[in-house]
Every structure is written in structure tokens, then in C-alpha cells.
Swiss-Prot record:
Location within or outside the cell: Endoplasmic reticulum membrane; Cytoplasmic vesicle membrane
Full protein name: SAYSvFN domain-containing protein 1
GO cellular component: cytoplasmic vesicle membrane; endoplasmic reticulum; endoplasmic reticulum membrane; intracellular membrane-bounded organelle
Species the sequence originates in: Homo sapiens
Residue spans, topological domain Cytoplasmic: 1-105, 127-183
Classification lineage: Eukaryota, Metazoa, Chordata, Craniata, Vertebrata
Keywords tagged on the record: Cytoplasmic vesicle, Endoplasmic reticulum, Membrane
């Protein structure tokens, strides 16, 4: 497993070196700055590295956005998953922190919350925005994507009846045979 990981990282590094601009632009940094930048990147967690490192896409990738990078497949693996699956190159927009739409939505919500707090309507804005996000977060069954698993089928793979739960028929029978409330 670690050998395959090392091969994948080597292939990724080769692809990254091929996509780098000429060394003339990197010569402007002093060796101390390069060492400090490398130490910062090594110490940063994975999600932070994506935002600290920004590499422009090579001209060939801009001309053909459908280009994909293929990882090397180990020769000795027959029953394991193949490593020759296509991995799309990340676009420069994917790496930009400011174009993350979720971040912008949260930032807008915080700014509006601050405004309404100053106007002394902060609690009303907070409660109304909670109802709005609950509405947005729920969706009807017609919006389900083709082939998407339901939560029930994820936790109960065969969709078998669970002992102690009511079936739809049992529930209907219980509701119809029950006397009306208050009579």
C-alpha cells in the first residue's frame, strides 16, 4: 500500500514539475525565503496547503480543459483497484480561496448579522435565517438525483424490515382502527 502511495506521489510530483513556469521567475526569491516558504507548507494541514500554494495552469491545460492526469498502475496488482483512473487537473479557480461560494455566503451572512445586531434586530435575523437555511437544506423527493442512495438504504443496505418497526400496512391499520379523539 505504501509503495503504491509513493508511486502516486512521484507521478504527481513529476506532473507538478512539468507544469511549473521557468526557473527565472523563482530566482527572485532569496534562499532564506524559499526555506521559510517550504517550512510553512510542510507545517500546514492539507486543506490549508491548497490555499497557500497557487500555481497557474499551464498553457496546454488552458487550451484543453478536458486534459486529465493518469497515475501509474503498479504491475503486481491484479485483484486491487486499478490506479490508471483519470484524475482531472485542478483549475486555478478551484484553488482560489475567494471564489469559494460557501465562504462568500457565510461572510455575507455574518456581515448582515452584524448589521442587524447594530439595528437591534439581531435575534429576529438569526431566527429567520435559521428557518431559511432549514428550508434550503431540505428538498423534495423529485429533486433526488438518479442513482443517489437514500439515507435509509445507506444504513440498511438490503432495505430489509427491521425487527420492532412498523410496516406501512401496520401503521394504516393502527390509524384506521383507532377511535376518534374526543368522542
Amino acid at each position: 500500500m505504501e509503495q503504491r502511495l509513493a508511486e502516486f506521489r512521484a507521478a504527481r510530483k513529476r506532473a507538478g514539475l512539468a507544469a511549473q513556469p521557468p526557473a527565472a521567475s523563482q530566482g527572485a526569491q532569496t534562499p532564506g525565503e524559499k526555506a521559510e516558504a517550504a517550512a510553512t507548507l510542510k507545517a500546514a494541514p492539507g486543506w490549508l496547503k491548497r490555499f497557500l500554494v497557487w500555481k497557474p495552469r499551464p498553457a496546454s491545460a488552458r487550451a484543453q480543459p478536458g486534459l486529465v492526469q493518469e497515475a501509474a498502475q503498479p504491475q503486481g496488482s491484479t485483484s486491487e483497484t486499478p490506479w490508471n483512473t483519470a484524475i482531472p487537473l485542478p483549475s486555478c479557480w478551484d484553488q482560489s480561496f475567494l471564489t469559494n461560494i460557501t465562504f462568500l455566503k457565510v461572510l455575507l451572512w455574518l456581515v448582515l448579522l452584524g448589521l442587524f445586531v447594530e439595528l437591534e434586530f439581531g435575534l429576529a435575523y438569526f431566527v429567520l435565517s435559521l428557518f431559511y437555511w432549514m428550508y434550503v437544506g431540505t428538498r423534495g423527493p423529485e429533486e433526488k438525483k438518479e442513482g443517489e442512495k437514500s439515507a435509509y438504504s445507506v444504513f440498511n443496505p438490503g432495505c430489509e424490515a427491521i425487527q420492532g418497526t412498523l410496516t406501512a400496512e401496520q401503521l394504516e391499520r393502527e390509524l384506521q382502527l383507532r377511535p376518534l379523539a374526543g368522542r
